[in-house]
Amino acid sequence: MSTKRQKIWLWTWELSWPQAIDTIKTALKLGYHTIDTAWIYQNAPKIASAIKESWVPRSELFITSKTRFDYIPDYQKHQFQKSDFSYSLRKQRLEKHLQDLKTDYLDELLIHRPTREENDLALLELLSSYQQKGIIKHIWVSNFPLSYLKQLHSKLPIPLSCNQIELHPCLFDPEMIYYAKTNNLQIIAYSPLAHWHLLKNPIIKHIAKKHQASPAQICIARCLAQWVSLIVKATTPEKLVQNLNSEKIILDHQDFDLIASLPKNHRYNNPPFSPTWD
């Protein structure tokens, strides 16, 4: 069994080759042990190489990945054929992903984005069979709006333990966070820096100067203050260390009030195939 997941995860999206291997090796050396990837990222071999060269035991790592339906442009409009959910097809893709990662199990697997209720329930049912075999330890979802989570709640074939969503000082969702706390669901934030848009914000910079921290650390600290874990990317040892040290920053009421004055509901990850958000 892998170690407990960290509050601050290493995000591996768009880590370029060969920089990715060096970045992941450095992160592991500095104390990261929770790694976020996805089948669509196509970087599993890089992660495997970095882990191998770092000599970190698999049991000390927490690896999470994501699955999604690809190359179906109108996948939110039509129900999939039963063949889309065939055990052999899913098994083949999952086994290839595990082979590329050079591991025989994942600590967590997420449904990357919602589609239709019948599709998502069918996929969760399939994933539960992998969970029963120990191939997947936990099954999560990502980008599921609150109304959709409530809609699925009584119909789920398995309990969910997490929803990974975009969250940052300009996009907080108190209703989602409250629902998560009252339903034993963890929230994992991605894009906690708002695609770097907040790093030059005068309010964030003012708070950073007060705490002798970087603007990125203030954004991360704000997420952590909501009892939210997060995934964040960095490509230099200095930034990797800064991100981890964000846990040490304690924001006060004045900081929270200033951050609350920032513009609200700014979503930076909203491609055409995104769900309809509440």
Go through the PLM ranges and name each one.
Residues 1-61, 65, 71, 275:
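N-terminal binding-site loop/beta-alpha segment at the start of enzyme catalytic domains
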Residues 2, 48-58, 97-102, 131, ...:
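Acidic (Asp/Glu)-rich catalytic clusters
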Residues 16-27, 83-101, 122, 149, ...:
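Short, acidic/polar
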Residues 32, 103-106, 136, 160:
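A structural motif
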Residues 59-72, 108-109, 143, 167:
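A short, structured active-site edge motif that brings together acidic residues
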Residues 72-85:
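Surface-exposed, active-site-proximal loop segments in enzymatic domains
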Residues 101-117:
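Active-site groove signature of glycoside hydrolases
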Residues 114-278:
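Beta/alpha (TIM)-barrel catalytic core signal, keyed to glycine-rich beta->alpha loops juxtaposed to Asp/Glu
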